[in-house]
């Protein structure tokens, strides 16, 4: 096993931290909300999880770092058994178009431009490879949707998608998806 492959199997340790805000619980899972108003320790943890998640995606930069100056960014970290097992990073962005799945499949640009409208955008939705196929990504996104008070179907979605990410977005938004600026 290569070092890169080994890194992908190691979860990020996540014990309870002072000041954390647990916003959802089910079975053995908790979701902790982190923002730029959270403690340094929580923001550093969110960055470690975002860097771990980046290993499983086509992105070259993490969806969140401590240096992120966006006061509105929201990071949702799923914890189970003292390990971070899921992540959703949302931030408000202007959306400028609707991409139908027909246009996406035919590699056409979004056919329906819209006036720029602020909308929460999913920068990343990730679950640890050992925790996939359990509905965790959907549960974390539902928690995020409740927290930002916006339906999942109206979120913008950052691309590119992994194959499993595209399948997930197709399930969440069967007609198509909003494209952020």
Model-based region annotation:
Residues 133-141:
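Glycine-rich acyl-CoA binding loop
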Residues 1-129, 143-181:
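Non-catalytic substrate-recognition and accessory regions of acyl/acetyltransferase enzymes
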